Swiss-Prot record:
Start-end of Basic and acidic residues biased regions: 289-307
Disrupted-gene phenotype: No visible phenotype.
Biased composition (Polar residues): 65-80, 246-259, 267-288
Family stated for the protein in its record: Belongs to the BRX family.
Domain of life: Eukaryota
Protein name: Protein Brevis radix-like 2
């Protein structure tokens, strides 16, 4: 029998159409079977979790037992990135999106993670925590700061942990102050500075004495009593154990406890205390080096006997006294165990004697003083 041509064409078209439909269905099944949105979301969430963990969010926590599982999950996520990118290549081409999108996302996140781990790129949160940690460490250390009390006067303070400040050094401008002007300024403004800057005053017996600082020219301005006579401290500061540099800078001077005791109780039964007579006294031993060289042998021994004072002053303190030779001139005399006397020091009131006048007075009256009191 002859078959109908129209039927044959229809069968052929049906067979061809069914094949196309099957191919389309297979492609749709592939697209449907591809977990496009779900896997992308899960991959993104896994990468975010890895980024958060790597950025140091759990840096303060102790390492737990699940760290090995996290490493496995990371390696599994990395393998998923490579496998999913290969599986989705064909489907993304059909959908019109580039196949390199998941690869770019995965590589970008991986590069960021590597940067976080290597320290090249630090998140803002992590850098903020680091800065706060460094700031707290700096707070534990003693901080020094400088205050300009007035033009030409700079004071260096140290902030104490328990509150208040400690005075480290005082600097005077050589263009505006000489040695005597600096001492006069300090005598007049000592209490104001201590109160204004909340300076804590410590007990000399419980606090270690500071070492003499270096001045601007690199030489130690303050000499110890063992090496030679030092620049005299003002009488107001003798009880506090403070001394002064000669010109450029002033600082604390280490003085022995027996010296401070000597200033406080030096047998002034017949003579008022020096602080009540004149707030600022100077010693002839510090007037000038040339004046020292003109002193007698007994005076130089008295000036250089700081070591003996610290050793035997406790037993001999009752044998020292002060005589007022004339207004503004005070002589300290010491009686030795063998019955002889020695001249300890001569002090002049700055209100009545300048440096030149004090030196001139001593040259004129040295013989009389030795004959009268020794």
């Amino acid at each position: 029998m002859l078959t109908c041509i129209a039927c044959t064409k229809q069968l052929n078209t049906n067979n061809g159409g069914s094949k196309k439909q099957e191919e389309d269905e297979e492609e749709e099944d592939r697209v449907i079977e591809t977990p496009r949105s779900k896997q992308i979301k899960s991959l993104t969430s896994q990468i975010k979790d890895m980024a958060v963990k790597a950025s140091g969010a759990y840096k303060s926590c102790k390492p737990c037992s699940g760290s090995s599982n996290q490493n496995k999950n990371r390696s599994y996520a990395d393998s998923d990135v490579a496998s999913n990118s290969g599986r989705f290549r064909y489907a993304y081409k059909r959908a019109g999106s580039g196949s390199s999108t998941p690869k770019i996302l995965g590589k970008e996140m991986e590069s960021r993670l590597k940067g976080f781990l290597s320290g090249e790129g630090t998140p803002e949160s992590m850098s903020g925590r680091t800065e706060s940690t460094v700031f707290m460490e700096e707070e534990d250390e003693l901080k020094e700061w400088v205050a300009q009390v007035e033009p030409g006067v700079l004071i260096t303070f140290v902030s104490l942990p328990e509150g208040g400040n400690d005075m480290k050094r005082i600097r005077f401008s050589r263009e505006m102050f000489d040695k005597w002007q600096a001492q006069k300024w300090w005598a007049e403004n000592f209490d104001k500075v201590m109160e204004l800057y909340n300076v804590q005053q410590f007990n000399q017996q419980s606090v270690p004495l500071p070492t003499p600082p270096r001045s601007e020219d690199g030489s130690s301005r303050i000499q110890s009593t063992k090496n030679g006579p030092a620049t005299p401290p003002l009488n107001k500061e003798c009880s506090r154990g403070k001394g002064y540099a000669s010109s450029g800078s002033l600082a604390h001077q280490p003085t022995t406890q027996t010296q401070s005791r000597h200033h406080d109780s030096s047998g002034l039964a017949t003579t008022p205390k020096l602080s009540s007579i004149s707030g600022t006294k100077t010693e002839t031993s510090s007037v000038d080096e040339s004046a020292r060289s003109s002193f007698s042998r007994e005076e130089e021994e008295a000036d250089h006997s700081g070591e003996e004072l610290s050793v035997s002053n406790a037993s001999d303190i009752e044998t020292e006294w002060v005589e007022q030779d004339e207004a503004g001139v005070y002589i300290t005399i010491r009686a030795l165990p063998d019955g002889t006397r020695e001249l300890r020091r001569v002090r002049f009131s700055r209100e009545k004697f300048g440096e030149t006048n004090a030196r001139l007075w001593w040259e004129q009256n040295r013989a009389r003083i030795q004959q009268q009191y020794l």
